[in-house]
Swiss-Prot record:
Protein name: Replicative helicase loader DnaC
Its biological purpose: Required to load the replicative helix DnaB onto single-stranded (ss)DNA, to initiate chromosomal replication. DnaC alters the inter-domain and inter-subunit interactions of DnaB, inducing an open ring conformation that allows ssDNA to access the interior of the DnaB(6):DnaC(6) ring. Has ATPase activity only in the presence of DnaB and ssDNA. ssDNA binds to the central pore in the DnaB(6):DnaC(6) complex, making contacts with both subunits.
GO MF annotation list: ATP binding; DNA binding; hydrolase activity
Probably involved in the interaction with the DnaB protein (site feature) positions: 69
Upper lineage: Bacteria, Pseudomonadati, Pseudomonadota, Gammaproteobacteria, Enterobacterales
UniProt cross-references to InterPro entries, sorted A to Z: DNAC/IstB-like, IstB_ATP-bd, P-loop_NTPase
GO biological process: DNA replication, synthesis of primer
GO cellular component, one term: primosome complex
Length: 246
């Protein structure tokens, strides 16, 4: 405390009389410094979690095509796209206020990945840790933990997947529908909802298809909080994507 007391006194002597100091006492200065240290530590911890998971899962995360996706460069041609854009943007802006998850379902090439990446990019800019992973990559890395040369266990991987602020699982329904895959997805959703962390899912399946694939238990947990289910029903516009739009 002596350091802060002496520092504060010197600061007061050097400061012009017409300038009001930000801190009224050395205790205020100490409290501010401790708070900044806490915020910095939390930020580093979040970044380390995301980096650790991206190292483990290799080519996961926001892919190059979607790295510059935002709400601003999402193309709107009709009311359906306007509706999903508004809802996705609101979800990102209100992320801190609830534990809601989301499901984007519908036809391929309709903008599900764009808006999911826009949510991810928005949250990264606001200090959150996010991870996008396909089911294929997820299961490949899960099965890789059984290898005798793996330096991470299945439990370690499940724990890390449950620790990022937002986990988005892509290509739900393109897998082989094995029992192990259902068990793993169920465990991930269960752990994340129990720890009040949100999960996003992207799929070409409709509501009935998702329920049949994952089971009522998983779908029910995805409804926690002010959850979001958006349906992308229009034609694909991938044929018009050049790669330099974003």
């Amino acid at each position: 405390m002596t350091f802060y007391n002496e520092f504060f006194k010197r600061l007061q002597r050097l400061m012009p009389s017409n300038v009001k100091p930000k801190f009224e006492s050395d205790q205020d200065l100490l409290a501010w410094n401790q708070e900044q240290g806490r915020l910095s530590s939390e930020s580093i911890l979040r970044e380390n979690k995301a980096m650790k998971m991206q190292r483990v899962l290799g080519r996961s995360g926001i892919r190059e095509l979607y790295m510059n996706c935002s709400f601003e460069n999402y193309k709107i041609e009709h009311d359906g796209q306007r509706k999903v854009l508004k809802a996705a943007k609101r979800y990102a802006e209100e992320f801190n206020e609830n534990i809601a998850s989301f499901i984007f379902s519908g036809r391929p090439g309709t903008g599900k990945n764009h808006l999911a990446s826009a949510i991810g990019n928005y949250l990264i800019l606001h200090g959150k840790s996010i991870l996008i992973v396909t089911v294929a990559d997820l299961m490949s890395n899960m099965k890789g933990t059984f290898s005798g040369t793996s330096n991470i266990t299945e439990e370690n991987l499940l724990h890390n997947l449950s620790s990022v602020d937002l986990l988005m699982i892509d290509e739900i329904g393109m897998q082989t529908e094995s029992r192990y895959e259902k068990v793993i997805i169920n465990q991930i959703v269960d752990r994340r909802s129990s720890s009040k962390r949100s999960t996003g899912m992207l799929s070409n399946l409709d509501h009935r298809g998702m329920k049949n694939l994952l089971g009522e238990r998983v779908i029910d947990r995805m409804r926690l909080g002010n959850s979001l289910w958006l349906t992308f029903e229009w034609d694909s516009y991938r044929q018009y994507v050049r790669g330099d739009e974003y």
